[in-house]
């Protein structure tokens, strides 16, 4: 190639050959800014070292230390390892996430916890006022059977003009009252249990 270059220079000393080494080397600086091939650090000038640092922060993402070399060198071991930098995305999304979550919390659990169960319990605690005829029919069946089946309760409910659910609840309450009365009567029969509270008073 040196011989070809020297032959070309001998032929036309005023105009260099387009394929000569001098022509190729002179055209390389014009193409370097466009292509920017990787070169060793030792071969670069101080001006060339400063040029790639300007576009570096814009090209990589700033969320992790793997993409951003400046974050790895600048940050402490805690921030460069990830906990501080990885939380950048959740912290950015934090204002958007509480809005849908706070709406149901304020609507359903808070309101149902304070005002919701109150009215529901009051509606469930609505007491039915039984007439004398209804109470007599219920007591008569209770004497015969303390645990009537569904069919018996339905027939009684139709006869006394009540719902079967009310009849079932009445029998549950009546059985609880009967057990309480039975315990009270059994405690009265035992003299030791009654004397001890009187003596203590």
Swiss-Prot record:
Organism placement in taxonomy: Eukaryota, Metazoa, Chordata, Craniata, Vertebrata
SMART domains: HOX
DNA-binding keyword on record: yes
Biological function: May have a role in development. May regulate its own transcription. May bind the bicoid consensus sequence TAATCC.
Pfam family, one: Homeodomain
InterPro entries named in the record: Goosecoid-like_HB, HD, Homeobox_CS, Homeodomain-like_sf
Tissue specificity as recorded in UniProt: Expressed in adult testis.
Gene: Gsc2
Protein known as: Homeobox protein goosecoid-2
GO cellular component, one term: nucleus
């Amino acid at each position: 190639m040196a011989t070809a270059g020297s032959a070309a220079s001998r032929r036309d000393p005023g105009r260099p050959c387009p394929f000569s080494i001098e022509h190729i080397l002179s055209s390389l600086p014009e193409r370097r800014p466009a292509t920017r091939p990787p070169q060793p650090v030792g071969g670069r000038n101080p001006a060339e070292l400063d040029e790639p640092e300007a576009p570096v922060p814009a090209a990589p993402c700033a969320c992790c230390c793997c993409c951003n070399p400046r974050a790895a060198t600048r940050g402490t071991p805690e921030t460069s390892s990830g906990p501080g930098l990885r939380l950048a995305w959740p912290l950015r999304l934090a204002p958007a996430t509480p809005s849908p979550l706070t709406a149901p919390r304020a609507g359903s659990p808070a309101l149902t916890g304070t005002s919701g169960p109150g009215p529901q319990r009051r509606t469930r605690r609505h007491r039915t006022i039984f007439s004398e005829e209804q109470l007599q029919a219920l007591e008569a069946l209770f004497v015969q059977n303390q645990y009537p089946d569904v069919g018996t309760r339905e027939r009684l409910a139709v006869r006394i003009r009540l719902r079967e659910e009310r009849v079932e609840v009445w029998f549950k309450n009546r059985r609880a009252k009967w057990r309480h009365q039975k315990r009270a009567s059994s405690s009265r029969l035992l003299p030791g249990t009654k004397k001890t509270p009187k003596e203590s008073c």
